[in-house]
Amino acid sequence: MTQIIPALDLIDGEVVRLVKGDYKQKKVYKYNPLKKFKEYEKAGAKELHLVDLTGAKDPSKRQLVLIEKLAKEVSVNLQVGGGIRSKEEVKALLDCGVKRVVIGSMAIKDATLCLEILKKFGSEAIVLALDTILKEDYVVAVNAWQEASDKKLMEVLDFYSNKGLKHILCTDISKDGTMQGVNVRLYKLIHEIFPKICIQASGGVASLKDLENLKGICSGVIVGKALLDGVFSVEEGIRCLQNA
């Protein structure tokens, strides 16, 4: 069953949205993050997604106090990402009550450390964020999307799927924050080649039609801007995924 996963991006406790990961293209929403997450939970969301953009820029400023409060106050699963670079950071987040930790660039830059983390904390606790951009082939971008690596997406998935990886969060970064619609072709391709991997789709969700198109392909669809801007509600998203 494909789930809608409402998402909040936080900078210094404020709810924001960036366009294509650019801190200069920042929109601040006057929402209290806890109230917003509780609203999403009440509406029927079973999982919530949080990006700690402050911690992504500076790990020493990770918003752990707020994250712990959010994890304690909501009764559904919370997953957190944002520039996580070490085993200690993963442990700190899990100790806060976070259900899953999202790790990204590390998977490309330090596979040994990434595999150690997968082994230590287990495949249910780790989500690999693979931000991808289409060159001649889909390649993985690193460092908050500022550079494309030479690693092909399918090769990275092949490597980690053989090492016990279960959850991925895949973002087509040409779409993120643009509300231009999702890249269904990309997710279908991953699902066909790696049917046992649970795919969370992210980037560009602009309508209920996007959710419909991803039903049965992805385990979850991360929705940020469309919910914050009132394009559709969590309830409508759930109904759409149940009926599509």
UniProtKB/Swiss-Prot annotation:
InterPro entries in alphabetical order: Aldolase_TIM, His_biosynth, HisA_bact_arch, Isoase_HisA-like, Isoase_HisA-like_bact, RibuloseP-bd_barrel
Residues of the active site: 9 (proton acceptor), 131 (proton donor)
Principal location class: cytoplasm
Full protein name: 1-(5-phosphoribosyl)-5-[(5-phosphoribosylamino)methylideneamino] imidazole-4-carboxamide isomerase
Family to which the UniProt record says this protein belongs: Belongs to the HisA/HisF family.
Catalytic activity: 1-(5-phospho-beta-D-ribosyl)-5-[(5-phospho-beta-D-ribosylamino)methylideneamino]imidazole-4-carboxamide = 5-[(5-phospho-1-deoxy-D-ribulos-1-ylimino)methylamino]-1-(5-phospho-beta-D-ribosyl)imidazole-4-carboxamide
Cellular localisation: Cytoplasm
GO MF, any single term: 1-(5-phosphoribosyl)-5-[(5-phosphoribosylamino)methylideneamino]imidazole-4-carboxamide isomerase activity
GO cellular component terms attached to this protein's record: cytoplasm
Keywords, ordered alphabetically: Amino-acid biosynthesis, Cytoplasm, Histidine biosynthesis, Isomerase
Gene3D superfamilies: Aldolase class I
Pathway(s) it belongs to: Amino-acid biosynthesis; L-histidine biosynthesis; L-histidine from 5-phospho-alpha-D-ribose 1-diphosphate: step 4/9
Gene Ontology biological process terms from the UniProt entry: L-histidine biosynthetic process; L-tryptophan biosynthetic process
EC number: 5.3.1.16
